[in-house]
């Protein structure tokens, strides 16, 4: 029995030395120490031995089992180290290679247009003011000379809330709130999001607008015209012809709509301007006396002018975009151009 135990130990030791990977080593463990392994079979045979031989043989088998387990554990550590070194060698990183930069984003074209507008007017001393997008009918309509029965309200397809509040249809409410809080003279612009029930190639339910306001004792329509001529020359980088057409807005009197020379054909006529040579860009006029009275400003002492234009419309003209909806579809392929 002693010879058999020694033979099994030698076989196990040799097999462990020859093992080249963890799978082979695990198979050796099963062959010698598993439920049907060689040493396990010896332990099962103790029942056939005499009472005197059982303790001695059992002790020898357990010693052999411990010795083989120790050899397997040592070999396992060795194989794992080799496996790790092989993996590191295969996955070696060349630290001298240049890194990969993350793609850099850019400002949305409408945001870029907003910044250009803000830069221009802030240099002229205009304050940039903002206000709530959820408004009351007073600030959105009534204070702007648009009472409940006024037919001009039909011009605004408005988003109403159940409690009578609404999504503002222009940024004019910001001007009303500012005039309530400040004493003239002052000048300001109010950029922001506005909302109307409209959606097509040139309209979206939400769009961006900027309105300007100046209240002074000597405000004139001629001064407004000169300012707008200078602004569009700055914005488009060249002098453009302007055309003022008489119009009607409840909050200004007189009122005008302003066209600029087509930026695509230089006024010669093309599809962009519907072959007229002109592009409509804004509405303006002298602030109506009723608007001044609504905010406790004496119209006999102070006068003012106001204008409003769509920033999305300016972005389309500046960048040559045909469909307004492209600005809001979050298409990175399109937006990366800017």
From Swiss-Prot:
Record's cofactor remark: Binds 2 magnesium ions per tetramer.
Query: Would you indicate the residue range of the signal peptide?
Result: none
What this protein needs as a cofactor is: Mg(2+)
Biological process terms from the Gene Ontology for this record are: phenylalanyl-tRNA aminoacylation
**EC number(s) per UniProt?**
6.1.1.20
Q: Which reaction does it catalyse?
A: tRNA(Phe) + L-phenylalanine + ATP = L-phenylalanyl-tRNA(Phe) + AMP + diphosphate + H(+)
Its subcellular locations are: Cytoplasm
Record has Secreted as a keyword: no
Sample GO molecular function, one term = ATP binding
CDD domains (alphabetical): PheRS_alpha_core (cd00496)
Major location (coarse): cytoplasm
Q: Where does Mg(2+) bind?
A: 253
Asked whether the UniProt record includes Zinc-finger among its keywords, one would answer: no
Q: What class of enzyme is it?
A: ligase
Instruction: Cite the PANTHER family for this sequence.
Output: PHENYLALANINE--TRNA LIGASE, MITOCHONDRIAL, PHENYLALANYL-TRNA SYNTHETASE
Q: Which family does it belong to?
A: Belongs to the class-II aminoacyl-tRNA synthetase family. Phe-tRNA synthetase alpha subunit type 1 subfamily.
Name of the molecule in the record: Phenylalanine--tRNA ligase alpha subunit
């Amino acid at each position: 029995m002693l010879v058999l135990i020694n033979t099994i130990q030698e076989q196990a030791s040799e097999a462990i030395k020859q093992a080249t990977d963890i799978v082979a080593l695990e198979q050796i463990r099963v062959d010698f120490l598993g439920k049907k392994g060689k040493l396990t079979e010896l332990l099962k045979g103790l029942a056939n031995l005499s009472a005197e031989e059982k303790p001695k043989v059992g002790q020898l088998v357990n010693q052999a089992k411990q010795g083989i387990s120790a050899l397997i554990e040592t070999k396992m550590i060795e194989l794992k180290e080799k496996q790790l070194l092989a993996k590191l060698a295969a996955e070696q990183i060349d630290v001298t290679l240049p890194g990969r930069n993350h793609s850099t984003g850019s400002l949305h074209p409408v945001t870029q247009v907003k910044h250009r507008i803000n830069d221009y007017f802030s240099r002229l001393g205009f304050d940039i003011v903002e206000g709530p997008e959820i408004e009351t009918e007073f600030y959105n309509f009534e204070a702007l000379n648009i009472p409940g029965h006024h037919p001009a309200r039909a011009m605004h397809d408005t988003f109403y809330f159940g409690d009578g509040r609404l999504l503002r249809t222009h940024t004019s409410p910001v001007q009303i709130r500012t005039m309530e809080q400040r004493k003239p003279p002052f000048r300001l612009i109010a950029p922001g999001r506005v909302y109307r029930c409209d959606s097509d190639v040139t309209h979206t339910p939400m769009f961006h607008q900027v309105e300007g306001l100046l209240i002074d004792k000597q405000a004139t329509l001629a001064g407004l015209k000169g300012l707008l001529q200078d602004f569009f020359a700055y914005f488009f980088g060249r002098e453009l012809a302007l055309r003022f057409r008489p119009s009607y807005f409840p909050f200004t009197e007189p009122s005008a709509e302003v066209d600029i020379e087509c930026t695509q054909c230089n006024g010669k006529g093309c599809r962009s301007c519907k072959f007229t040579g002109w592009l409509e860009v804004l509405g303006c006029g002298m602030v109506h006396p009723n608007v001044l009275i609504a905010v406790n400003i004496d119209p006999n002492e102070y006068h003012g002018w106001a204008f409003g234009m769509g920033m999305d419309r300016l972005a389309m003209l500046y960048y040559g975009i045909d469909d307004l909806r492209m600005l809001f579809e979050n298409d990175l392929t399109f937006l990366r151009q800017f």
